[in-house]
């Protein structure tokens, strides 16, 4: 597949996701999403869509994976560059900034589906472990002097807080998210300054 074909396939995939989201917002039921209707709206064949997606659930699963893979790539670059405790703290904070910056206008719906559709829930649970592992590494390197028990307890709590934060922030207007993000980051930093525990 050449560059032009790849670009077209990415564009089509994005359009399919957008049409599926629009259909879901309108009909409120995932069962109402139709490959035939989406194909007709986009003026493509059903085969074009099924070459990317096996089921309607697969549309949302792949969108979820795409978003998180992009976020992890960005985060991993920041972690790889880190050398000092300050660098690791920065990589910790940058993750939250990037997460909020890249939330789509349909983030609320994607979040709800990640907690509802079986394959999306499986991916979410697997990804949660990956996120926690990175929090653990960053807490250990960014706030040195803590013992392993404290690091594990803090990384577990930060993970729980982060997923609660996600549930909240996807449901508020985009122009209000930066204030919530700032408060959330300040709260985490205050907690993580304690070497014994919160």
Question: For each predicted feature, which ranges?
Answer:
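Basic, helix-initiating cap at the start of DNA-binding domains
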Residues: 1-29, 37
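Amphipathic alpha-helical packing segments from all-alpha helical-bundle domains
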Residues: 102, 118-144, 152-156
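Alpha-helical DNA-contacting segments of helix-turn-helix folds
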Residues: 15, 24, 58-70, 123-127
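Amphipathic alpha-helical segments used for helix-helix packing
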Residues: 100-122, 167, 171
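Hydrophobic/aromatic-rich alpha-helical bundle segments in the mid-to-C-terminal region
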Residues: 142-188, 198
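Helix-turn-helix
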Residues: 15, 26-58, 62
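Hydrophobic alpha-helical connector segments
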Residues: 62, 76-105
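An amphipathic alpha-helix signature
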Residues: 89, 93, 97, 129-140, ...
């Amino acid at each position: 597949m050449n560059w032009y074909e790849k670009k077209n396939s990415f564009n089509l995939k994005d359009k399919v996701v957008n049409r599926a989201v629009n259909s879901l917002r309108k009909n409120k039921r995932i069962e109402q999403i139709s490959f035939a209707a989406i194909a007709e709206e986009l003026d493509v064949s059903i085969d074009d869509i099924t070459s990317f997606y096996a089921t309607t659930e697969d549309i949302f699963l792949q969108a979820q994976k795409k978003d998180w893979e992009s976020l992890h790539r960005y985060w991993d670059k920041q972690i790889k560059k880190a050398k000092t405790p300050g660098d690791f703290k920065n990589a910790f904070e940058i993750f939250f900034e990037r997460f909020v910056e890249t939330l789509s206008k349909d983030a609320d719906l994607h979040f709800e589906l990640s907690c509802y559709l079986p394959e999306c829930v499986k991916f979410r649970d697997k990804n949660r472990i990956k996120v926690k592992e990175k929090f653990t590494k960053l807490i250990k390197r960014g706030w040195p002097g803590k013992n392993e028990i404290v690091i594990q307890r803090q990384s577990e709590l930060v993970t729980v807080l982060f997923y609660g934060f996600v549930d909240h922030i996807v449901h508020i207007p985009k122009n209000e998210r930066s204030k919530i993000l700032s408060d959330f980051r300040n709260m985490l930093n205050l907690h993580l300054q304690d070497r014994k525990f919160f």
